[in-house]
Amino acid sequence: MVYVYINVLFIANFCSWGTTLLMGPGNWLILFFSALYAYLLPLDLQPRVSWTVVGVLAVLAILGEILESAAGAAGVTRLGGTRRGALYSIVGAFIGTFTGAMMGVPIPFIGSVVAAVFGGALGAFGGAYLGERERLHGDRFAIGKGAFWGRLLGTFGKLIVGAIMLALVTVDSIF
């Protein structure tokens, strides 16, 4: 019966990991479901998720957030952007992600995901561009481009951390 629970945990964590593409709290959901599993699974059932792994997952979730935030902010500030530009970039990424997810692109099965990721990056570009409105067009464009690449790299980094978390908890729950 424990292997049924392991499969449910894997499916919940995999779906949670996927929410990262939509600016969702995927890594935090992986941590939540894994901690809930470790807490609720009866002690006599083996194998189980250890609390040590749950602690490592917490550290990795924090690392993923820092990585995503730092990449996005660095994309704006590295090119001389202001805090307002960085804030507008975050808001633009949020709007772009959901607009992209709703509109999608005509790629079977993964069109909405691709559109959400690139919509978020384009939204970050637009937000940073609007946030630097007192600058010249060339500077605004460069800062927006930095926000675009920062958003893409931040999302990619957070996805990698989430994949490590998913692999870690899956291996620990099986062995």
Q: PLM features: what roles do these ranges have?
A:
Residues 1-19, 85-95:
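Small-residue-enriched transmembrane helix starts and helix-helix packing motifs
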Residues 1-4, 38-54, 105-106, 171-175:
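Helix-coil boundary and interhelical linker segments in multi-pass alpha-helical membrane proteins
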Residues 11-21, 67-77, 130-134:
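C-terminal ends of transmembrane helices
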Residues 12-30, 95-112:
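Transmembrane alpha-helix interface/packing and boundary motifs in multi-pass membrane proteins
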Residues 29-46, 96-104, 118, 122, ...:
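Interfacial segments of multi-pass membrane proteins
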Residues 30, 34, 53, 57, ...:
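Alpha-helical transmembrane segments of multi-pass membrane proteins, especially transporters
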Residues 59-104:
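Helix-adjacent hinge/juxtasegments
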Residues 135-175:
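C-terminal binding/interaction regions
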